[in-house]
Each structure stands twice: as C-alpha cells, then as structure tokens.
Amino acid sequence: MFYSEPMSDRAPTYSIVRPKGRARMSSLAPSRSPYPIGGFPGLSGSLVRDLTASGAVAPEIVGSVAIAAMSLLTQGLADISWPNGQASSIGANAIVVSPSGSGKTVVYNWFMGPIEKYLEHLSAADPEGWHCGLLQEDPTRPAIVQSLDDCPVAGLFTDEGGVTQKLLKDSATLVKLLDGTPLRSARVSTGRIALKEQRFCMLLMEQPDRFDETKPLLGGRKGGVGMVNRFFLVHSTGRCSASALHDVRLSEEVAQAYEERVLECLGVLLEHLERGNRRRPTLSLTAEAYQCFIEIDREARQKCTPASRWFPFSEYIVRHAERVLRLAGVLHVFEHGVGGEISLDTLERAESLANWYVESFAQIFFEPPKPTLAETDADSIAQGILGPCLMGGVYGCSVADLRTAAFNLGLTSTRFTRALAVLCGQGRVRMIRHLNKPWILFDLAYSPLNW
C-alpha cells in the first residue's frame, strides 16, 4: 500500500490564485514557488519522489510527465461532474520545455515503458486491435482524427522539435478534442469523420530555442488562441551530468506497483472499448470538496479583473478551476479507481499542483511593461544631463536652461515638458520658484537657501 499524508498536515504553498500565509510575490515579475511534490498522493507520490530523490532531474519535469502519463491511463475510464451537474472529461496536458541533457527522456521512459510494453503484448496477440492508436506520434490533424476514429482514447506524446508550432494551425480542432467535445464533421483523406465521446491528451517536449520561437504565436497573454490554456507548462533550464542520470530510477517495489496499476487501468479501458465506448462512470465531489471548488473558481475569477496585475493572463487563470477539477479526476481514478467520490484532500492536492502551473505560465509569458515615450525621454535627460551636472557639482538650473540642453538630445519642447513631468512625478527632480522664475533642483537634498 502507498499512503499519503493529508494536505492539511503539510506546509502550505503560495499561489497567485489562492494566496496562503504571508507569502509575497514580486511586484515586477511573477515568481515561481518550489514544485509541490507533496501534491501527489499514494502511488503517484511514490513515483515522483523516487525519480526526484537523486536531485538529477528537476521535480517539475518529473511531475509534468507523471501527470500526462496518468492522464493517458485514466482519461477513458471516467468523467467528472461539475457542480451544475454537467459531465466533463478528466485528464491533463503538458508542455515540457527543457534542453537536451535535462533528463526528461529518462523520466519519460520510466513512466511510458510499462505502457508501451503492455501495448506491444496486445499488438502481438491482435495486430489490428484498438491499442494500435492509443499512443500517437503523428501530430497532423488528419492523422489524429483518423486515429481517434479507430481508437476513441489516445494521447499524442512526442519530443519532435517544433511540434507545438505545427499544432497551432489546427488549434480549433485540437481544443475540441482535448475538451472531449463532439466533433461533428472533420475532413480526412477518406472523407469526413464524426467523433463523439473521444478522449485525447498531449505531452509535448520541446527544446527552449524552438519553444521561444513559438511562444509569441501561442498567445499566452490576453487574446491568445486558446489551446495553450488547456496545458500545464513548465520551462526548466537545468542540465544534469550523465552519471547523475543513472541514479534516476524507481525502487523495485514502486516499479512493480506501477506496472500492476498500468495493467489494471489499460485492462479496464480495453473492456470499456470492447463494449463500444459507452458512457463512462461520472465522478462527483464530496460536499466539502464541492464548497472548496466553488471557492477556487470564485477566487480565480477575481484575479481576472482589469485592475489586477494578473489580467494579462486572465484567459489562462479563468480556466484554473477546470484544470483543477480534471486533474483531481485523474488523481482519484489512478489511486482509487472509478468508484467513490473525490475527496477534499484529493481536490486540494490537485489545486496545489495547478497553482504552481499558473505561476509557471505567468513567468513564461511575462512581458515587462514597455516604457512610454515620456519615460524614455526622462531617462535620456537623467543620463545625458542630470548625471553629468551632479558629477560636476551643479545641483540645479532654470527650466529654460534645461530645455535648451534637452534640444541637444533631440527632444522638442513638447517632449521635454512631458519628460519633465515624469521626472518630477518619479521624485528624481523637484520644481521650485527661485528669483521669480521656475527652477529645477537635481539634488533634492540641496536647498537654494544655501546658494
């Protein structure tokens, strides 16, 4: 048995969605908390702890691959109910951005090895069976749609360079597939295909350089394409030595338990598909978890107001509760099967993980505000005129003299006036009246009474 300590007994982690304790974030750029490994319960927690124990691979890489692998195993087994009674698919998608040598392939092999081994066993017994389409490698829309028509539960797991950019042109279709929304008519080479009750998840592993080229196209800030809002994103820059990678492994007990869980999940999925992919069991939240979920959604939406500094990421944050709910469904099914209700503890664990990914998303797509022309001109005056004057022992001058000097910097009278207002507003200079004319003090501690 694999046990997990309740969330209430663990140290709280800070979130921009539901801040706890006295944690503070930078007013300049979003910060990112340590990855909440404790958010994984039971067997999933043992898997993540084993693979991060050596410290060779970043915890966020291990956790993201774990979430994607568990989603592949569980998404076809159950749905989850929203508070209003509507059913939704479970599952999560991840984009892992890290350089070669970061260890993501080693982690991927540990999680996907038992799955691929089982699929090879099924393929040997039945070469034309549904299992041939469970793992997709072709990122083109026709191939994905055709595969889901053959096998309505699938995952696109790939480390092909630039694959994220290739998928963007088909984002409208992919969003429906990721959400589990019916696709009434999709054109493929053999005609048109209608999909219903399909379940699809993605794990995309990218190199930093290729991802940086794609990032502006993803629309992570307000007004984006929408597909990226369905993903957990992680950008890790660390590399580990080749010798350290040899220490990334599962203990014999955990590896055996994981293999058994893979066989169990895929066995149930096989039975479900052989019965014609009928409606899945629908999970619901306990009364306590229900109230917590309402609060999560309410507080996330409060972060999306125009006055909030998180407003640029509001399209991602507004889907925070949805990602929490779908991830909670994954954790519950992976740990407990399709029976019972999702507990408050499971929901809080899913929230702690999803909170971290909100911070990660904001950090990845953060853009410092661009200075206005007046602010740029103010900096030019400070560097080109005020600085040299102070170094030369000049602590002030008339407005007319400063305006004349500003012409040498290419500033017109109008631009100078606006820049001067910025300098005064920033407290870098002070305007006074001296000898019946406007005077500018460069050194605010210097008094004209001493002149």
Placement of each model-derived feature along the sequence:
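Phosphate-handling catalytic cores of nucleic-acid transaction enzymes
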Residues: 2-451
